[in-house]
Amino acid sequence: MSSSANETLRGFYVEYRQQLYTYAVSITRHREAAEDAIHHVFQQLLRRGNLPADLRPYIFMCVRNAALDTLRRAKTRGDSIFDETTELGAQDAGSNVPLSVDELNQWLERLSQDERETIVLKIFDSFSFQEVADLRRVPLSTATSWYRRGLAKLRTIVAEENL
């Protein structure tokens, strides 16, 4: 891989690492699995050599596929490859993670995979509805429906929690 492509990837990672991580965690629901998926994608891209012109949707698609592959491999083995402490919502000992972050994670867990992914991409990763639809390979109307349905469920969940 050329040094300019290497620098391009490095710059992309620095700019989007948190968004990629948030997206991968929304799929895997496990921190280490999300990190592994992202690591795998960037290793593959570094080996590949040529990069597409529009990196953002391409790399998010690669991370999605790697995260889903991680889930499939775990399911095929029929065992849990994750330690209880790595699951979303579990705090590390001595962690100062605000309760609201844990609450948000718990609320997102109650949505379908499609709704959760769409909301994370739209709100946290600033994807347009068209970008979400392209990434997920679904019609635009499907992506917007997942988003609206997910937000409606979140409003209901928040209202129930605040009673």
Each predicted region: which residue ranges?
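Sigma70-family region 2
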Residues: 2-3, 39-55, 73-75
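Acidic, proline/glycine-rich intrinsically disordered inter-domain spacer in sigma factors
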Residues: 11, 77, 84-109
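A short pre-motif secondary-structure segment
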Residues: 118-122
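A short, charge-rich alpha-helical start-of-domain segment used by transcription regulators
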Residues: 1-22, 32-35, 50, 116
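Structural recognition of an alpha-helix C-terminal capping motif at a helix-to-coil junction
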Residues: 22, 36-43, 53-65
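Arg/Lys-rich amphipathic alpha helix in sigma70-family domain 2
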Residues: 54, 61-82, 97
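DNA-recognition helix of helix-turn-helix
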Residues: 130, 136-163
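C-terminal flanking helix
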Residues: 17, 21, 42, 112, ...
